[in-house]
Amino acid sequence: MRIAFPIAFLLLSLPGFAQDADMLRHFDYDQHSSLDVKEIGVEKRGGVSVYDISYASPAGGRVPAYVVVPSGKGPFAAVIWGHWYMDGSEFLNRKEFLTEAVALAPAGVVSLLIDYPIARPGHAPDETDLNENMIKDRVQAIVDSRRGVDLLLARKDVDAHRLAFVGHSYNAATGAFLSGIDRRFKAFVLMAGSLSDQVSMRSKEMQDYRQRVGPAKFDAFMAKYAWLDQGKYVSRATPATVFMQYASREPFLTPQRDREYAAVVSEPKLFKLYDATHALNAEARRDRIAFLTEQLNLKSTPPQVIASVPELVNPPEPSTTK
């Protein structure tokens, strides 16, 4: 399982505007460059169309994605969905939320489901400690999401004032960054993710990791990337509303730590803890859809339709025996 790796350590609170500009420049891109959208195919699911597409990434290469479109002319709300990074899961890709997006479409939602960098062909994960590729992948995930906003808002059937982001685990952190970077979003659902490096760094696990890799090396790396702390962004999400969903049965994201993350997030916000594993559960899905329905002014989705969405499951832990 990959949750956001803590990047900031011993951060200082500097005066506002200059610090904001310095942080935000890391996520700049050319909004006027061509999206170069390529349609690969389309599948009909009842009255919903699922387009298999790709678009140009500002970081180079292509962003594979699904665009889920309801029937009718709109204007529709829009949601970007960010999948988890759970090792061993068949849904470590844009398919995680596909059935949920199709179920929500008739309520009046166009959805964009992205394959984030780890899920793309040719991506080679770098498992070494404190490597630069993890920084590159994180920034690319954020910028590719912002480019996804450009794609959605270029559609004539999308209402620019009703845009939300749903992110799970690693991409909950992506949403945390976006909440303080891109003001085009009205609402965020952040599911079972690390939302503050300063909170994470108080954990025994991270202090043990610091000792293992070497305090001097660790501290130098963290100082270099002090701007990449989710908490410094999600603490400035206002006026967007942030709904945090956490699971009670997790080893690292304990209920106490979850509440500490929630305390960092700006108002307005909601927090709920579920009796679930990292995959969360059907109750969380019902709450998520209810939140999006309220925030984006959607039609109601029948309970039986929500209940028909299959449960996401945690893959089995790797065996330590042969």
Give the predicted meaning of each segment.
Residues 259-322:
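C-terminal catalytic histidine-bearing segment of alpha/beta-hydrolase fold enzymes
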Residues 146-205:
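Primarily recognizes the serine-hydrolase "nucleophile elbow" in alpha/beta-hydrolase
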Residues 29-73:
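N-terminal cap/lid segment of alpha/beta-hydrolase-fold proteins
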Residues 65, 75-85:
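Short beta-strand element of the alpha/beta-hydrolase
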Residues 82-143, 149-151, 200-207:
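Cap/lid segment of the alpha/beta-hydrolase catalytic domain
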Residues 218-233:
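Active-site nucleophile elbow and catalytic-triad environment of alpha/beta-hydrolase enzymes
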